[in-house]
Amino acid sequence: MIGTSTALSSRSLPFAGPLLSAEILLPLTAVLLVAVPVFLQAPLVRQAPLAAALFTLPLVAAAVLLERHGRGLWQQFGPLLVGFSGSWLAGCLFWGWFREHPLLHLPIEAFALPLALAGLGGRWRLAGAFYLASLLGTAATDTAIALTGLMPLWPQVLSAPLSEAPLLLRQAGETVLEPANIALVTAMAALLIGVCAQLWKQGGPARVSAATLAATLAVDGLFLAAALLAPLSSGLI
């Protein structure tokens, strides 16, 4: 199971109170890393995909510096940032150059899968915990899109003229709201919430995985809602 090998350090940051230990701050940071950049990354990648992808370099550099020279929680933020860097780069690659090919989404997002799995057994376990949970959330979202019949609309929306894309998104919204699809999405959400709960109970890096998975699902849902309700401001079209 993700991140079961070692518990998180209980040392706090200089500004952290007794309740803001690693068990709270690291999952909270994971949530912020998932949520904060998403609605900024989509339009940035659309306008300057190469610049967005190259931003991975300073992210990784900062992560390595933290891991090697940081102390306490600062050191643990390094591997967490490495995991985020992998997800960031994958998103830039797909949405920058392959966005009209939905079948390539998951393979591109999984480009660092071997490294993430290998990292679970060493000092980069937090990187693997974050990346793998983010990948699982992405896989769940793509599966839901495929099972609800939205996958064929994906390339149509992205390649359509600006005047037609909102209409296609409205059609997608109507498809999602069909009773069978609502039941399917609800069942998948309940299953994944159960997975998050089990990971959270394990503590350690698994708690980071739980927070990352939950945040990924929530953000994907919000992004889909934004695309359906306010397509021009979502960065999708």
Question: Where are the regions that the model predicts?
Answer:
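Transmembrane alpha-helical insertion/packing segments
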Residues: 11-97
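Membrane-helix interface "capping/anchor" motifs
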Residues: 69-79, 97-103, 120-130, 200-207
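Cytoplasm-facing juxtamembrane segments at the starts of transmembrane helices
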Residues: 16-29, 102, 124-141, 203-216
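Juxtamembrane membrane-water interface segments that cap and precede transmembrane helices
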Residues: 6-13, 31-37, 161-175
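Transmembrane alpha-helical segments of multi-pass membrane proteins
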Residues: 78-93, 136-139, 211-220
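Membrane-proximal helix-loop-helix units in multi-pass membrane proteins
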Residues: 98-167
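C-terminal membrane-adjacent module
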Residues: 138-237
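Hydrophobic, membrane-inserted alpha-helices
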Residues: 32-37, 59, 86-93, 109-118, ...
